[in-house]
């Protein structure tokens, strides 16, 4: 095999030398240079030259791609973090980042090429982008150091990178790019930014017992790897958040992410072309993540039809290529849903009755959480958050009115934006009295219509 490869390379090299000598004999120097540059751009000659250099080179190369087969490469992230953290007085190229005004400046290496030495072995890292825009870290080292590099060195780099990343862990929120742009855009499947929502379980305005139940369930899931391995079930969990607008569904998701330190993947189903693209997005999510589909009853027609009927007309024809209910069900708990670990899936809806029961049954959505109108317990949390008070002589009147009215926590919070305590509480009482009067009028009108 070696002899055959050597013979083939020798034959190709001889052919190149013949072409080159012919060019030098019959063409002027400028034409020679133009032709030589043109030949270099021809893919077959470029591949040939790369193979020749690789064959005779004493160096070996290891590439770490950001995406491998549509899946995120965790080794790439660890290597990139490790290289970026190697900051000292000898480094000439740095980049500074300050994501918040009151945070300290974060310095990272911004070198395209980085020289590294480990146990007396020299090697070189390069960071560059491939044709599709994804980054690649390439390690170059002498072949004689193969055992050291592929053994202890790479283990050290990956573990150190993971350790640095854990110490500087930041929650990110990602949204899926429209599938029509996947081939032309350099952004890939997901676009991300840092998540800065301050919500915590302490500040959530909801029933304390229900909040504690959700908190304990999340912690048990986070610490449940051995449990899920023992029962032979994929390490994932589903939560259905339902209730009127303004009851804190999005805030609950933010509190979940801040508690778990998981990234949020905000999945917009209407920008996905078909079920295959939905699977592709799932594969591209990372472990320790929360996949969110907000207002799922508005995203697609998921009210009971498992298949989209093939009706006439362009409008109906387009539907056949869209995400179907069966595709979404496979996304939740099909074979492909087990391609990662430690994932949480969250659906939100204002109208739970509109959803197909197959979508929200136990096992898919393990916990159904109703976020309803403001209770007195939720009000007390809001009063502590906004006004920094635990009690007040107007609390009794407010408690009585809350039992007789329907008002969301968001509306209650709006009346507490003023820092003056008495004025805020009195304004809330007036609002509750107006709501109570309006509700009574509606009841009387309904009774009159019934008569």
Curated annotation (Swiss-Prot):
The protein's required cofactors: Mg(2+)
Task: Tell me the SUPFAM superfamilies matching this sequence.
Answer: P-loop containing nucleoside triphosphate hydrolases
Has UniProt tagged this entry with the keyword Manganese? Answer: no
What is the E.C. number? 3.6.1.-
Q: Name one GO cellular component term.
A: mitochondrion
GO MF terms here are: ATP binding; ATP hydrolysis activity
Q: Where does ATP bind?
A: 243-250
Q: Catalyzes what?
A: ATP + H2O = ADP + phosphate + H(+)
- Which residues constitute the organelle targeting sequence? 1-48
Q: Where in the cell is it found?
A: Mitochondrion
Q: Does the keyword Phosphoprotein apply?
A: no
One Gene Ontology BP term is: response to stress
Q: Which UniProt keywords apply?
A: ATP-binding, Hydrolase, Magnesium, Mitochondrion, Nucleotide-binding, Transit peptide
Query: What superkingdom heads the lineage?
Result: Eukaryota
What's the chief localization of this chain? mitochondrion
Q: Name one Pfam family in it.
A: AAA
CDD domains to which the protein is assigned, alphabetical: RecA-like_BCS1
Q: Which regions span the lipid bilayer?
A: none
Q: Which family does it belong to?
A: Belongs to the AAA ATPase family. BCS1 subfamily.
What name does UniProt use for this protein?
AAA-ATPase At3g28570, mitochondrial
